[in-house]
Amino acid sequence: MSSFRLFVFSVWALALWGCAPGDAELTADTADHTVAKWGKLNLDFDGPATSETAVPNPFTDYRLTVVFEHDSLTLTVPGYYAADGNAAETGADSGSVWRVNFRPPLAGSWRYEATLARGSDLATAPATTAGQAVPLRGATGTVFVAPAGPDETGRLVRAHPRYLRWAESGAYFLKGGAGSPENLLAYQDFDGTRRHSEEFRDGESKTEGLHHFRAHAADWIAGNPAWRGGRGKGIIGAVNYLAGAGANSVYFLTMNINGDGKDVWPFRTHDDFTRFDCSKLDQWEILFDHMDDDLGMMLHVVLQETENETLLDGGDTGPDRRRYLREMIARFGHHRAVTWDIGEENGLNEWSKQYGYQDSVQQLAMAAYLADQDPYRNHIVVHTHPSDGPRRDLLTPLLGDAALKGLALQVDEPENAYAATREWVTESADHGQPWVASVDEIGPWYRGLDPDAGTIVSRTGYRDPAAVRAGGGLPNNALPNNQDSLRRYVLWGNLMAGGAGAEWYFGAFSAHNDLGMEDWRSRDRAWRWTRRTLDFFRAHVPFATMEPTDRLTPPGAWTLANPGRSYLVYLPEGGTTTLDLTSAPGTYRLRWYDARNDEMTDGGTVAGRAKQTVTAPAAGDFAALLERMEE
């Protein structure tokens, strides 16, 4: 039996689709607050006046929790200290506002009760530790949630072994987004943002300063958000452009202390993990709100990188790590499409020994804490090492874990993306907890995805797959632009192996690299072909009912199949292959998809109960889509 038929829907996901509305008595006129289903509601409570630097510390010694209760579901949502409640605009570091962000998954009436308590290190203590109650004005109330609007997608939830799905629309999510710059949040207009060191290690991407995104300022349009007199237009314009070009996700670090960029952290300073910067985090939220509400983008939140995975509590999920994760969940976990990534290049590899690394026990503890504390059950993944051995050492002990839901695969060479995806889709399903697998960093590390007009010089004798087959590649010389190869071997390779898409990494030494990227138009062509590929799958391929298989075609072709119903055969080099339909009854309509030029043509019909030869209609890579015709 195929793995998707064995997959059990989560209780939470079923609740979102199947529950009845709440109390009929409560209406928009009688409730304390109103919001549409899946809309964001900020509830501000007037509590004790304090500051980011106060004693008792509002981030360690207070805990705000709000319980939201619907007839069919109860959510316990962590809150946070919000200074004056308008810190993004005022820059305030003091005030008496305590806030919770709530995004209701069910229409009808909700009741809420907020509890603020005080005690030494109470913020990270077990929930059973009560602390001393602190009065809150407006601690109880009601929320009336109207039905979702006609264009509402809802939250991304796990309702399939290999794919996420929008809870309201039911559409499956395939990812095509930006994996660079990883230090997106090192932006000049965010308060308290700077580099804490000007040292660069050999082989790192280098940046001359913070991001400005001046090339995207013109992409900001009237009505878009900004803060403090018009700040933020560069980064808001940047994500506007990216979404308009077809990208639907962005990968970014929220803490790179001691890492490559050394310019992103949520704290007041880079060396005190007990106090957060309220105005900076409120400004991050302006960006995230725009990406979510206005652009429909996934937030791929990478919580640490390899150089700092033991910075907090030596890698354990101790007080510092719990405090950090709780603040991220409280402020940002409500968004519709959040992926929590426990760390970039997480775990042991040959270079992480010098920094310290998390072992599998620590990794699983971190994932478990995220799963336990996040009321919205957001997607949890780990970013891997690039080569087979270290990746296998990292992932094997994590197989079968219930909290970890997916992989952000790093793959050393483009031609290995299919095999890497296929291996871990299969292994995870065999261990009872299938992973959603995307390729989120493609190697080699120095190159990634070339700019549209760019070529680079090979650093390690890397051979472009297409160039090798054409005559040997160009090691240690200028290489041909690799976008076409990455489209075929990485994006198509991942999708045909049962993966869920890709985010594009820009390498250490290419123009607009992984740290220094200032203009996403440098890869404009890549965003367009990524969108076209995913649009083809979304519009024409019933991929959620299909499984990757190596049994029906010889090497050189990749196949997704729902045997007896539908088949997709991809030929990365074009040419001819055979498709074994000996066990498939009926007649099949054949359509050819020209993957490079985004064109579909009719290929006639193909009979079942035989091995059939299929030949691409022209040079280049093609996909054959076969669907059984009605008798």
Regions found by a protein language model. Give the residues of each.
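Extracellular glycoside hydrolase catalytic/binding regions
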Residues: 323, 344-516, 521
